[in-house]
Amino acid sequence: MGTTTTTRLLKAHGLPTHRPPTSPGEMVLAFLEDLGRSQADAARAVGIKATRLNEVVKNKRGISADTALRLAAYFGTTAQFWLNVQTAWDVWHELRRRAPAYSAIRQRQARAVRENAHTIA
């Protein structure tokens, strides 16, 4: 895999090039530590099993829409915040694994995209 291809694609997607973005698990752990709460406390408060939250913290499970909504309610954020953290993590790892394949795809841009590029993000 060409590192210049990978770097170019990571930059194009607004992702760090020399390190992975903050993982969903690291983010959850940082919020918990800031509040002085345990994973078990948070899991009980949001109505999920402690093992489910622990798997998120260990990056063995991604943040689903349901989990994002629960974390948002608990931490006073938005569900989109948590989904964005998960997406950045997933996209970074996929680009590192398959950059040449993605780079080889020939772009075709629909008129709707060209005309509304400023509203699509």
Annotate each predicted stretch with a short phrase.
Residues 37-55:
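Short alpha-helical DNA-recognition segment
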Residues 81-101:
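Short amphipathic recognition helices of helix-turn-helix/homeodomain-type DNA-binding modules
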Residues 60-73:
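Short, basic-rich loop-to-helix N-cap that marks the start of a DNA-contacting helix
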Residues 34, 45, 74:
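Residues within the alpha-helical elements of helix-turn-helix
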Residues 36-37, 66:
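Residue-level signal for the short linker/turn that defines the boundary of a DNA-recognition helix
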Residues 1-30, 34-35, 100-121:
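N-terminal flexible/basic segments that precede or flank functional cores
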Residues 58-60, 87:
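Residue-level detection of the helix-turn-helix DNA-binding "recognition helix"
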